[in-house]
Amino acid sequence: MIFKPKNSPYNLDNKGVYSAWREQKLALYPATAEDLLVTLSGDPNTAGDEYAAMQERLADFNMVVYAHRPIEADEPMASKKFLNTLIRRFGLLRLDAHQCADDDSISLLSVAEGGERKRYIPYSNRAISWHTDGYYNTPDHQIRGMGLHCIHPAA
């Protein structure tokens, strides 16, 4: 069991704090998907307005969507290094090395023609409804954040 301070909105024993948190989140609910969007100049160490805009959306919506001009697969934006650098700026420091992850704990999602990955929807051309895995993990290994960096449009 994870300790939740009495004044935490996640401590459901404190209905007043939870209700205030819930009302604030509902008031901030994005009207359109574009409300989640931040356009990046290309540097994963982005500073100033871009970083502040991403932080604001994370605080308001618990997520942010970023976009960049179309890129070639061999450009730095296409690399796992870009994603890793960016997510670390937002506190995602411990990556989950699940059974299909690469050595760096980052998974490239593409259609797998064989092997273990072929069995799982993220490595197929079947429709997926994203969720954060890890609900079955122990409390000290729960997944509390996720970074997705799309190089190519979905099939």
Question: Which residues make up each language-model segment?
Answer:
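Fe(II)/2-oxoglutarate oxygenase catalytic core
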Residues: 2-155
